[in-house]
Swiss-Prot record:
Function comment: Provide a mechanistic link between auxin and plasma membrane H(+)-ATPases (PM H(+)-ATPases, e.g. AHA1 and AHA2), and triggers PM H(+)-ATPases activity by promoting phosphorylation of their C-terminal autoinhibitory domain as a result of PP2C-D subfamily of type 2C phosphatases inhibition, thus leading to the acidification of the apoplast and the facilitation of solutes and water uptake to drive cell expansion. Triggers plant growth probably by promoting cell elongation. Regulates branch angles and bending. Probably involved in light intensity mediated root development.
Domain of life: Eukaryota
Lineage: Eukaryota, Viridiplantae, Streptophyta, Embryophyta, Tracheophyta
Principal cellular location given in the protein's record: membrane
Similarity remark: Belongs to the ARG7 family.
Record organism: Arabidopsis thaliana (Mouse-ear cress)
Compartments in which it is found: Cell membrane
Gene Ontology CC annotations of this record: plasma membrane
Quaternary structure (record): Interacts with and inhibits PP2C-D subfamily of type 2C phosphatases such as PP2C67/PP2C-D1.
Full protein name: Protein SMALL AUXIN UP-REGULATED RNA 9
Keyword Ligase: no
Length: 104
């Protein structure tokens, strides 16, 4: 029985990540004429972090990291994913840089 529950949790998490990817990729399509999205390589997406909204282009593989998923959940709760300002992560930039240094 525990196996079924963990499989359901994994499927639910995979579905959530798929939705996030869809939203991120649709941001790029909506703003193709915008120079901000021309420099985003395939397999990456831009996020905006901190008080000054510093822009980071991050690999999609980071969506597998629990810590990054937690940041995305905070972003969804605070801003939602469907706003004009891009995917904004409500996190201090120093904390974000420290976190992503662990992913590399």
């Amino acid at each position: 029985m525990a196996i079924k529950k963990s499989n359901k949790a994994a499927l639910s998490q995979a579905a959530s990540l798929k939705q996030i990817l869809k939203r991120c990729s649709s941001l790029g399509k909506k703003n193709q004429g915008n120079c901000y999205f021309n420099d985003v390589p395939k397999g990456h997406f831009p996020v905006y972090v901190g008080q000054h909204r510093s822009r980071y282009v991050v690999p999609i593989s980071w969506l597998d990291h629990h810590e990054f998923q937690s940041l995305l959940q905070l972003a969804e709760e605070e801003f939602g994913f469907e706003h004009e300002m891009g995917l904004t992560i409500p996190c201090d930039e120093v904390v974000f840089r420290s976190l992503i240094s662990m992913f590399r």
